[in-house]
Amino acid sequence: MTSEAVRRVQSGSPWEESFGFARAVAAGDRVIVAGTTAFKGDMLYGEGDPYEQTKVAFGTAVEAIAEFGLGIESVIRTRVCLAHSRDVDAVGRAHKELFDSVRPVTTLLVVQGFIDSRVLVSVEVEAYRGAVDS
């Protein structure tokens, strides 16, 4: 694959600059979105609310795939990392509201924690340019 076949999008997160990564990368038919939280700039949305943090984080991820001309119907995989297993119902509810009509494969993990202890959820998304309903 040539470098011309790979495109990158930044979201403005300070961590992208600090750690040297892109919010999303398109390579061929795949678009992969990096771990995304409810931070926008230096502000955390939905502090203490895993449902709201999930919605905001997925919103940012969907904005990233939109930069490549894709919508939510193109999402084929999500991965959700939770700080607390007690939040699984709230996070699952937010995920279903967004993806019920799409039904991507999904992995939910409980992790030890995040860089900022106020973060309750981090999400990853993978989209496919050739996604179709079945």
Swiss-Prot record:
High-level lineage: Bacteria, Bacillati, Actinomycetota, Actinomycetes, Kitasatosporales
InterPro entries: RutC-like_sf, YjgF/YER057c/UK114
Protein name stated in the entry: Uncharacterized protein SCO2049
CDD domains: YjgF_YER057c_UK114_like_6 (cd06154)
Species this protein is from: Streptomyces coelicolor (strain ATCC BAA-471 / A3(2) / M145)
Domain of life according to the entry: Bacteria
